[in-house]
């Protein structure tokens, strides 16, 4: 069952094209990664899904309801964490958490206290005194303490240290085990690779790749290092081998995943002494699409 469904979303801001035909589908109990650099269209897509802005073209629904016309009804079942959290400066962190949780009709004080402890947050301090990381913690505690069916997280670990990132990841997996759905927008590829069932990569307002992590890994290459007692003739002519480099009798190269089995059989004929391989990573695919664009 599709919890989120977006079809052919288009959005312009003046002459700037923010979205150009975005399709997205997130199913029940799924963690869906939405990745791309800043300015690629992630936040614009999320704002359309939340009914904050209206798409110029296309359709978006959550729980089968229209994202724009039924936004109030949808929000009763959604927890949202933005990447840049702004809080009421005269309230304490604990007061803000209580406000958000009560607005959602939840009142699980044990869950609230457990999350405050996990995220190492002092809820008695005024929000004006919080660092960016602590403001992010307030938003995360408020979201995870709510009894939502869908969690939309836009760059949620921005400002968190590695230890708190791990706590965040544990909380996300806890939610998934409860059968809830999560849309995770991020540019931290290791985080997405660790957590997500499916991924979409967005670039300049267009989805350029989408699928499960296994499906996407087949689109990129395996790194391999070998050492043989016999010289391998014409290795650069072998189908599926790329970017050969040699240093201290060690050959390193890239291998097309679909050719991996045949390549191993071929090089094994030359008295292998050493073979190391590193499987394809999401980062490899991401960088293949973005290299040359001035970074991410």
Tell me the role of every PLM-derived stretch.
Residues 2-6, 11-203, 209:
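ABC transporter nucleotide-binding domains
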Residues 28, 93, 213, 279-282:
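Structural motif detector for alpha-helix initiation sites
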Residues 1-2, 219:
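Extreme N-terminus of proteins, especially the signal/transit-peptide cleavage junction
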Residues 70, 212, 262:
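Short acidic active-site motifs
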Residues 123, 179, 220, 268-271:
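Residues at helix C-cap/C′ positions in short coil/turn segments immediately following an alpha-helix
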Residues 168-254:
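ABC transporter nucleotide-binding domain
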Residues 222-296:
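Short, charged/small-residue-rich alpha-helical element at the C-terminal edge
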